[in-house]
Amino acid sequence: MEEKAGLGRLQNQQDEPAQDPHQRAGPRATFHSDRNHPNKEAEAMEGQNPACSRHASSHSIQPQASKPKKHRNYLDGAAVDDLKSLWDRLQTLQQSLTNMPYAEGLKPLKNFASFEELLSMGGDSLLNDLLDIQDSITQCCMKVSKYLNKDGSCASLNYYKQPFIAAVYGPTGCGKSQLLRNLMSAQLIVPAPETVFFITPQVDMIPPQEIAAWETQICEGNFLAGPENTVVPQSGSIMPKFVQMSYAELTNEANYDVTNPTNVFARAASKGPLAIVMDECMEDLGGNRGIAKFFHAFPSKLLDRFPKCTGYSVIVVLHNMNPRRDQGGNIANLKIQAKMHIISPKVHPSQLNRFINIYTKGQPTAISLLLKDIFNYHRLNTNFDWIVYNTEPIDNCMHWLYLSPDEGLIPMYLNIQAKVYQAMERIHRTITDRQRWTRYYHSKKK
């Protein structure tokens, strides 16, 4: 009977110690199979006898891994700090949405009166959802930090993405020419161009003062401060070239063929990176002569043929975001191929609103209205600030950026603002559900 009862036990259990404390215990049983066990009817450890059905042992060799709880029932100090950080962001966004003039048609969201009320009345489900949102915000901030400078500004506009096609929108007097030079001198376009082609309808349209400013600032952008009061060039050229061209010279058929020895762009690309800046050419762009190949086909051929040409940039200045005249389709192709849309807040609000409605379809309505309010604020209170939309950002936090002469290029973190607004909606839904069930309870009680 004892032998049958011991079939379900483990064979490596230690023998009971002897009564004498100085006496050693008997030998431990070893792991074995049926062939070398003194009792041939004993069962093996690995369950090699499937025909014999028995109940599983209550003591398993390896304990099962404990499953994590779906919700935590208590909040530690770190969790409270995370909730407080999210609560501060939430309060700031809620106040901004309430005070902005575009909030008339926006549905007001219910919220707790204080952070203490949120902790005491929120409930485990709500608090854990808010902690998940805060964790995703923290991960977004950590992910984008490696692309930023120590002061939080962006190190570049394109981060070596090629080709770099940008459209600049702004009325007369908003500082477009100064912006173009600042992009070169501030080294926001990498790699720094060794040759800059400045395209205007006529060559004599550029005053000597502006030519001197261009030559000075592109030279400034080619150097960085080095050790012991030295400067380090950022390209293979000590002095970058500034080349003036008319729009007619740009559209010369020879300049489209990269194999043509007279192609000015091919000769420049054989030495290093280049940039093409088109200013005051909006009327010519709207004509019949198509130059869309400069935005897509020509860059790939140039970059493949000349290894030294590690950068190809085209920056086109437009006075109107939606021009009526575009016979050659140049402006339409430019908007499609452009990776950057640099917009002055001085642009007419109707054009701005149309652009925002198109490029913020994936965002909540409140975030789109917030972006319109930001444009409106800078239109009324600043002069030379710009807002940038990046179609292919290196990080989602950089879809929308703010460019200031004082602060540099700063991400606007609209994706994080959307997450904060998601937390506001979650709190609103919880409070609304509780109020609905309270009304239902009182109606049944009567």
Curated annotation (Swiss-Prot):
ATP binds at G170, P171, T172, G173, C174, G175, K176, S177. GO terms for molecular function: ATP binding; DNA binding. Residues 439-446 are annotated as: DNA-binding. Its main location: virion. Disulfide bonds: none annotated. GO terms for biological process: DNA-templated transcription; nuclear capsid assembly; regulation of DNA-templated transcription; viral DNA genome packaging via site-specific sequence recognition; viral release from host cell; viral transcription. It is found in: Virion; Host nucleus, Host nucleoplasm; Host nucleus, Host nucleolus. It holds the Pfam family Adeno_IVa2. GO terms for cellular component: host cell nucleolus; host cell nucleoplasm; virion component. Residues 31-43 have a biased composition (Basic and acidic residues). Residues 1-71 are annotated as: Disordered. It comes from the Viruses. Keywords: Activator, ATP-binding, DNA-binding, Host nucleus, Nucleotide-binding, Phosphoprotein, Transcription, Transcription regulation, Viral genome packaging, Viral release from host cell, Virion. Induction: Expressed in the intermediate phase of the viral replicative cycle. Coiled coil: none annotated. Component of the packaging machinery which encapsidates the viral DNA into preformed capsids and transcriptional activator of the viral major late promoter (MLP). Binds, along with packaging proteins 2 and 3, to the specific packaging sequence on the left end of viral genomic DNA and displays ATPase activity thereby providing the power stroke of the packaging machinery. The activity of packaging protein IVa2 is stimulated by protein 33K which acts as a terminase. May be the protein that pumps DNA into the capsid powered by ATP hydrolysis. Homodimer. Part of a genome packaging complex composed of packaging proteins 1, 2 and 3; this complex specifically binds to the packaging sequence on the left end of viral genomic DNA and performs packaging of the viral genome. Interacts with protein 33K. HAMAP family: ADV_PKG1. Belongs to the adenoviridae packaging protein 1 family. This is Packaging protein 1. The gene is IVa2.
